């Protein structure tokens, strides 16, 4: 209804065209910028009206029309007008001429035909063409009824389009007291519901001022309209105006006033409605009262030039725009040309003022520091977001965008009369169509670029002189430059065009200069393992239970396929072990001492670093927090506080205790029969469940070097007999030891123990179906409830700790279970029932479930059950801690981090280690994990994975090397070797990437997923040796970068070597200059043996079809290699070959054995030689020493330093003050002789000579190096450094069974390295000599060595990478005399230069 009233009222009178010139009066907005800037200081505003209407008699209708427009703009805000001085109103006398020209333009614009509006796509309307048009009926104005401070609103009227009807005979309708006069200068148009943002204008008023303003306004309007505006009724348009809906009083209560309390008048300009209809001249972009001022220079120097960088209230331009205009609207405000619709039909609730009132300074209260254009309202669409530009109903909200300092506006206000002409002009662009991408980008660029960079439309077509006059002055530009501050903007909210190439960053972590960013090089894609569905299925079954039914295949065909696959990998493992055994030495299983806690902390330290760094870090912990050393005599058989069964092993010092299940019965283990041939578990043979319980112990093994037998209990096993008066139990099934949870290693009792090999035996109790927990579901956080408490499900959740005992068959009545039923959360059942500790089921919520599940599960239930079943394990010499873990737990984390600082990541690892120890104390009451040896493998894996920082590889290392479970950890060395040898198939590589150019290898989890289903049937000893040989092979031969392929014993089967060899053949030969210079790359690849070459060519042929399919390369014809030409020997050469020169010295070839024996006889019978100086006599003890020159004591190279050392026997007098060598240590104590004249810091021997030596004499000065060297050479005493075997230095205890070290690794005694000991020559004269390779790490020592030298080093030599302090038992760096790294040598030479 309201729309209908507005439509009808707008057509009551035809538009009046003013014909007479207008008298001078101020424009719509006659106040200056300076007045706006100071308006916030006013605290009182009131309206001063002029009741004398005689001043309007001389005005024409056009003047009255303009005056009415001005009055309507003033009173539309419904706020009191403050009293101002009359200075500003006198500035508008020069505007009459411009307004007269405007009135003529208005007449022309009104008579034009309006354009048809564009129909909205989202809301189509049906046009009724055939319906007759209705004549508009004049209607009396309707007073708005105000109830409770709210104006009643008219209902919505149906939308009907009407054409313009002009009637000149209609009279003007008087304006009611509730609304001001509204005149219509446009044809009839549609009325739409609009939003009233009057609340924004109310921010300048307090709630009390707003209520008083409404009352004063209502009373004042009634009084003045009754008395003073009667003369205007005959002149104005008779079209009634629909009063604008007023905001309710309740909405005004939430308006926040400004601090200065000033009121802000509003002018409602319905620009959005005009933009929608696009009705020609009435909606054109024209400022009817100020368009003539657009071309003025001062108008174009307005303060919007400062808008990009100025702020108000802590908000930037961009932030305010995004806040005021919702959605993605692009608000483009142009300060040079805009629209201002002054149609009287769009003005509501207006009042009329006289010219005298205007001249008295009514508008002087408009001094604002912002762009207060005409109103404070912005119309933004709510129902639908648009990407077009926002429509401004009233532009005074742009006040928030600009803030102008007072001293900057003074330059523009130097001419008051000229500055009065300046009006704020705002362009509002309305998008008709959906903007394209190019338009969007252009709009964004316009919004980002400052207005200072744009030229107004009025500048186009002007001469250079005009442009020169209109440009900014030099003073203005200099002032702008002076005020320019890079810190003015907020960097967090700054909008800048982003391009990767022009990005800049702070160098040096924010403390350095701003430099262009260096784009990160995109890494090459990581290759992936070609996994089949069957492998993935078996992998999942193995995670749940190693003895699952489908592990060997779901049908006969799959079972046969798996048997063939496992036979292939068994052959590969045997072949690899055999070859590496010949080169890298004997690395079969020999037990080390150490606790489970040591190994868990050891895997923390070995993550992502080399072994020599991680081993040094653990040695530092043992040195800083040592355990009090207890002699071995104090470690007798461990006892338990409760009555227990003594399980005795032959030739063993260790005993275990278990609860009195069978009344103090004894268990005797019988010896196993030796088996010369290794036996593997067949794929069709029933293997032991992963939940079996095995009682075992570690024992010392007598090591020999001649025997190569493997004694195993795979086939025959060992029997367990339990003698008891009440009942007798026997073991139903004996299972192979390679699947046992814990393996017992024993020595065979023989008459010749030094000729025997290790014999394995185990005592096992079959407890099937226990702890069958899905490991995958633990990782995925899925909880599976138990189906039956008496039936163990393979999907048992980790919240259920159960064990099913059905391995014993009682000959008599069963006895009571030893499990204490009073333990919380545990229940005891007999005859195969489940011992369970059930926890409430958790909901599935991703990662959060994992944390809740770990907290909810009682891991101590595993310990209680293991101790109830196998007894409490006491600390023995074999299971004693290497480090005082209680002291580490109580120490400061910074102290622990400082101890392992050399390893790297010290702070993070120190926190993890202390967190691990804290959890052990909180969960179990003590730092002890020996009970984990009696826990089933699957449960042990789940428990270890629950610790923070332990992954699958780390857990598998602990299980295989410490707990002796069936596992095969895949680290970086194992994964790289498996890929290069072709054990793991890869998905097709990109065309440009070859196998030998791989920088990244597949994920280790995927490699293990492929290998483990094929290696799961191997025994534990084979898996241990295979793992140990592979990680050593990765350090010595198959390094990540520049592997030693020439010396590799596996190059005939290596795909990496085949790819590199094929690439080297196709490569162009190097230049002669390049051939003469030393190459930093590895040695050139030698041709393999004939059979190896065929295998390598097959690999290349297999890889070619894939390339032919995807790669199209030009055919390159390679010429055949020329055949070697046979040298023709001339007749003269043949004759000269048999010509003998009588003056030539003949070469005498001696029999060295006979020569040695004769030399010994001469020395024995000829006593005269012994009377002289024996040190200068030539003594040849063997044929080898007689035929070869004496080797040097020290051979220095860049990567390694070779030292000739003497091997000291255990009974040597030099070892009287040292610790006794461990019986299982394969290495001996060594003595490294110093070169005469050498010092601890000397790198190369001195070549200087003394002046006394020219006369055959030696000086007595102690500082003379040359003379002292000669004296030491002739003396009977030499200096030396003791080298300690690594196993003896660590007292046989180290994490992960000592796999950190090499089997032939020694440590240099730090004390004798600094101060060498004096050794008589007679004590070392007949000792065997060995070679020790000193270096920084094992890979650098063996880099570039031949196969023969590597083999000699492992079998007859030793390696040394660190020193050892015998007092603190901590690691030390090697002194310069033993080895000086090439990197430090280069730095030292550079410093000297």
Curated annotation (Swiss-Prot):
Residues 653-672, 816-830 have a biased composition (Polar residues). GO terms for cellular component: nucleolus; nucleus. Residues 117-126, 243-256 have a biased composition (Basic residues). There is a cross-link at residue 901 (Glycyl lysine isopeptide (Lys-Gly) (interchain with G-Cter in ubiquitin)). Belongs to the DNA glycosylase family. DEMETER subfamily. InterPro entries: DME/ROS1, DNA_glycosylase, Endonuclease3_FeS-loop_motif, HhH-GPD_domain, HhH_base_excis_C, Perm-CXXC, RRM_DME. Although strongly related to DNA glycosylase proteins, it differs from these proteins. The DNA repair function may not exist. MBD7 binds to chromatin at high mCG density regions and then recruits IDM2 and IDM3, thus bringing IDM1 to the methylated DNA. The specific histone H3 acetylation marks produced by IDM1 create a chromatin environment that facilitate the binding of ROS1 to erase DNA methylation. Expressed ubiquitously in both vegetative and reproductive organs. Induction: Down-regulated by UV-B. This is DNA glycosylase/AP lyase ROS1. Stimulated by ZDP. Stimulated by XRCC1. The gene is ROS1. CDD domains: ENDO3c. Binds 1 [4Fe-4S] cluster. The cluster does not appear to play a role in catalysis, but is probably involved in the proper positioning of the enzyme along the DNA strand. It is found in: Nucleus; Nucleus, Nucleolus. Keywords: 4Fe-4S, Activator, DNA-binding, Iron, Iron-sulfur, Isopeptide bond, Lyase, Metal-binding, Nucleus, Transcription, Transcription regulation, Ubl conjugation. It catalyses: 2'-deoxyribonucleotide-(2'-deoxyribose 5'-phosphate)-2'-deoxyribonucleotide-DNA = a 3'-end 2'-deoxyribonucleotide-(2,3-dehydro-2,3-deoxyribose 5'-phosphate)-DNA + a 5'-end 5'-phospho-2'-deoxyribonucleoside-DNA + H(+). [4Fe-4S] cluster binds at residues 1038, 1045, 1048, 1054. Signal peptide: none annotated. Its main location: nucleus. Interacts (via the central region) with ZDP. Binds to RPA2A. Interacts with XRCC1. Interacts probably with a complex made of MBD7, IDM1, IDM2 and IDM3. Interacts with APE1L. GO terms for molecular function: 4 iron, 4 sulfur cluster binding; class I DNA-(apurinic or apyrimidinic site) endonuclease activity; DNA binding; DNA demethylase activity; DNA N-glycosylase activity; DNA-(apurinic or apyrimidinic site) endonuclease activity; metal ion binding. It holds the Pfam family RRM_DME. SUPFAM superfamilies: DNA-glycosylase.
């Amino acid at each position: 209804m309201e729309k209908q009233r507005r439509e009808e009222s707008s057509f009551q009178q035809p538009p009046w065209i003013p014909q007479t010139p207008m008298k001078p009066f101020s424009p719509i907005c006659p106040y200056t910028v300076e007045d706006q800037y100071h308006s916030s200081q006013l605290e009182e505003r009131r309206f001063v009206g002029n009741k004398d209407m005689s001043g309007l008699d001389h005005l024409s209708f056009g003047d009255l029309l303009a005056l009415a427009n001005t009055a309507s703009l003033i009173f539309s805000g419904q706020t009191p007008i403050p009293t101002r001085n009359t200075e500003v109103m006198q500035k508008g006398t020069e505007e009459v001429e411009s307004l007269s020209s405007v009135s003529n333009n208005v007449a022309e614009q009104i008579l034009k035909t309006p354009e048809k509006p564009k129909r909205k796509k989202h809301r189509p309307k049906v046009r009724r063409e055939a319906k007759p048009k209705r004549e508009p009926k004049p209607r009396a104005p309707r007073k708005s009824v105000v109830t409770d401070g709210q104006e009643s609103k008219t209902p919505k009227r149906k939308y009907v389009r009407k054409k313009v009807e002009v009637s000149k005979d209609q009279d003007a309708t008087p304006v009611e007291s509730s609304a001001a006069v509204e005149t219509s200068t446009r044809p009839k148009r549609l009325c739409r519901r609009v939003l009233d943002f009057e609340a924004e204008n109310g921010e300048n008023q307090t709630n009390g001022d707003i209520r008083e303003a409404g009352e004063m306004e209502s009373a004042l309007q009634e009084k003045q309209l009754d008395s003073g505006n009667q003369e205007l009724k005959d002149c104005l348009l008779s079209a009634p105006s629909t009063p604008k809906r007023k905001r309710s009083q309740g909405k005004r209560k939430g308006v926040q006033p400004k601090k200065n309390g000033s009121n802000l008048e509003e002018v409602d300009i319905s620009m959005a409605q005009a933009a929608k209809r696009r009705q020609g001249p009435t909606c054109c972009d024209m400022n009817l009262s100020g368009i003539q001022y657009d071309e003025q220079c001062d108008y174009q120097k307005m303060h919007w030039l400062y808008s990009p960088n100025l702020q108000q209230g802590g908000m930037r331009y961009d932030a305010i725009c995004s806040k005021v205009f919702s959605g993605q609207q692009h608000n483009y405000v142009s300060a040079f040309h805009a629209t201002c619709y002054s149609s009287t039909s769009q003005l509501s609730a207006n009042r009329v003022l006289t010219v005298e009132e205007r001249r008295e300074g009514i508008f002087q209260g408009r001094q604002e520091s912002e762009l207060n254009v005409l109103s404070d309202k912005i119309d933004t669409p709510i129902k639908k977001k648009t990407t077009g530009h926002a429509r401004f109903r009233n532009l005074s909200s742009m006040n928030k965008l600009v803030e102008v300092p007072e001293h900057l506006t003074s330059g523009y206000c130097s001419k008051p009369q000229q500055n009065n002409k300046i009006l704020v002009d705002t362009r509002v662009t309305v998008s008709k169509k959906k903007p394209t991408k190019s338009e969007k980008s252009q709009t964004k660029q316009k919004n980002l670029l400052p207005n200072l960079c744009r030229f107004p439309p009025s500048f186009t077509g002007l001469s250079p002189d005009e442009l020169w006059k209109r440009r900014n002055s030099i003073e203005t530009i200099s002032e702008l430059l002076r005020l320019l501050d890079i810190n003015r903007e907020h960097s967090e909210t700054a909008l800048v065009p982003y391009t990767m190439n022009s990005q800049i960053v702070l160098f040096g972590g924010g403390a350095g200069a701003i430099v262009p960013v260096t784009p990160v090089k995109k890494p090459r894609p990581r290759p992936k393992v070609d996994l089949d569905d069957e492998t993935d299925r078996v992998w999942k079954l193995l995670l749940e239970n190693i003895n699952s039914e489908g592990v060997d295949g779901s049908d006969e065909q799959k079972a046969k396929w798996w048997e063939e696959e496992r036979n292939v990998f068994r052959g590969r493992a045997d072949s690899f072990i055999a070859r590496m055994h010949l080169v890298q030495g004997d690395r079969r299983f020999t037990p080390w001492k150490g606790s489970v806690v040591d190994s868990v902390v050891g895997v923390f330290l070995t993550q992502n670093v080399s072994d020599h760094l991680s081993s040094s870090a653990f040695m530092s912990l043992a040195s800083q927090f040592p355990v009090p050393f207890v002699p071995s005599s104090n470690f007798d058989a461990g006892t338990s506080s409760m009555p227990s069964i003594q399980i005795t092993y032959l030739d063993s010092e260790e005993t275990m205790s278990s609860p009195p299940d069978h009344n103090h019965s004894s268990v005797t283990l019988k010896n196993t029969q030796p088996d010369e041939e290794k036996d593997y578990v067949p794929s069709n043979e029933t293997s032991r469940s992963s939940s079996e319980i095995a009682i075992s112990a570690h024992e010392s093994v007598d090591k020999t070097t001649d025997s190569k037998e493997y004694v195993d209990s795979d086939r025959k096993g060992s029997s367990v007999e339990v003698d008891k008066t009440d009942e007798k139990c026997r073991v139903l099934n004996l299972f192979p030891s390679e699947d046992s949870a814990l393996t017992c290693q024993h020595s065979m009792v023989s008459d010749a123990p030094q000729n025997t090999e290790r014999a394995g035996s185990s005592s096992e109790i079959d407890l099937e179906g226990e702890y069958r927990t899905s490991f995958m579901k633990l990782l995925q956080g899925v909880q599976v409830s138990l189906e039956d408490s008496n039936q163990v499900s393979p999907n048992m959740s980790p919240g259920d700790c159960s064990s099913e005992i059905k391995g014993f068959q009682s000959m008599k009545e069963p006895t009571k279970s030893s499990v204490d039923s009073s333990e919380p959360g545990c229940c005891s059942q007999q005859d195969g029932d489940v011992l369970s500790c059930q926890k409430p089921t958790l909901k599935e919520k991703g990662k959060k479930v994992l944390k809740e599940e770990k907290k909810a599960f009682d891991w101590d239930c595993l310990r209680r059950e293991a101790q109830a079943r196998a007894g409490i394990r006491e600390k023995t010499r074999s299971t004693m801690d290497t480090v005082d873990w209680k002291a580490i737990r109580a120490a400061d984390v910074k102290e622990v981090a400082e101890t392992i600082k050399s390893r790297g990541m010290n702070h993070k690892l120190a926190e993890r280690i202390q967190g691990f120890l804290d959890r052990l104390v909180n969960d179990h009451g003590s730092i002890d994990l020996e009970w984990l040896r009696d826990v089933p493998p699957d449960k042990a894996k789940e428990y270890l994975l629950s610790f923070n920082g332990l992954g699958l590889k780390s857990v598998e290392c602990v299980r295989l090397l410490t707990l002796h479970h069936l596992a095969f950890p895949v680290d970086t060395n194992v994964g790289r070797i498996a890929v290069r040898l072709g054990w793991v198939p890869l998905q097709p590589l990109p065309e440009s990437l070859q196998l030998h150019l791989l920088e990244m290898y597949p994920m280790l989890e995927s490699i293990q997923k492929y290998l483990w289903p094929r290696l799961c049937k191997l025994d534990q000893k084979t898996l241990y040796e295979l793992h140990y040989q592979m990680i050593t092979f990765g350090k010595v031969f198959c390094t990540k970068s520049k592997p030693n392929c020439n010396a590799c014993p596996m190059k005939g089967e290596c795909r990496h070597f085949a790819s590199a060899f094929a690439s080297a053949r196709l490569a162009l030969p190097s230049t002669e200059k390049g051939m003469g210079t030393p190459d930093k790359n590895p040695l050139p690849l030698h041709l393999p043996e004939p059979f190896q070459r065929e295998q390598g060519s097959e690999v290349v042929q297999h890889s070619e079809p894939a390339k032919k399919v995807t790669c199209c390369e030009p055919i390159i014809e390679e010429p055949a290699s020329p055949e070697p030409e046979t040298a023709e020997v001339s007749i003269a050469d043949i004759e000269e070959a048999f010509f003998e020169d009588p003056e030539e010295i003949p070469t005498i070839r001696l029999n060295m054995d006979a020569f040695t024996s004769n030399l010994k006889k001469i020395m024995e019978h000829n006593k005269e030689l012994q009377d002289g100086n024996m040190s200068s006599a030539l003594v040849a003890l063997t044929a080898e020493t007689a035929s070869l020159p004496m080797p040097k004591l020290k051979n220095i190279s860049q990567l390694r330093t070779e030292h000739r050392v003497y091997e000291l026997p255990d009974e040597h007098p030099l070892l009287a003050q040292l610790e006794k060598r461990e019986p299982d240590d394969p290495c001996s104590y060594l003595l490294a002789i110093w070169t005469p004249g050498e010092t601890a810091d000397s790198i190369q021997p001195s070549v200087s000579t003394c002046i006394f030596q020219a006369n055959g004499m030696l000086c007595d000065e102690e500082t003379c190096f040359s003379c002292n060297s000669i004296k030491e050479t002739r003396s009977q005493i030499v200096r030396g450094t003791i080298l300690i075997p690594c196993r003896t230095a660590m007292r046989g205890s180290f994490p992960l069974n000592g796999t950190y070290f090499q089997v032939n690794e020694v440590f240099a005694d730090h004390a004798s390295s600094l101060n060498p000991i004096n050794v008589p020559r007679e004590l070392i004269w007949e000792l065997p000599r060995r070679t020790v390779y000193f270096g920084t790490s094992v890979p650098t020592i063996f880099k570039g060595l031949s196969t023969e030298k590597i083999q000699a080093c492992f079998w007859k030599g030793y390696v040394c990478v660190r020193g050892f302090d015998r007092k603190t038992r901590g690691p030390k760096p090697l002194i310069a005399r033993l080895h000086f790294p090439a990197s430090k040598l280069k730095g030292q030479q550079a410093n000297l230069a």
